[in-house]
Amino acid sequence: MTAATDANWAPLEARLNGDVEVIHEFMWMFGDKDTGVEYYKHSITRRYLLLHRDGRCFQQSLNGLVEVDFGTDLRRVREHPEEGR
């Protein structure tokens, strides 16, 4: 992996249609230049949202990155642990 150090908010901003309130819940951690995936960490749940530069959403698996539904993964990332019980 070749890590990018310049924050790229464009994929998150595009997927959230510029919803600043939700965007501010996230921290950009790094980008992977090899895969084109940006890693955003939710500031409360500490879960990661992985977005490709083209907007596709991924989760890390034992076999590498797997494409997943953005809406479903956004809910997973934002869901507080006590809400998921």
Where are these regions (language model features)?
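Mixed-charge, Lys/Arg-enriched low-complexity segments
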Residues: T2-V20, Q60-R85
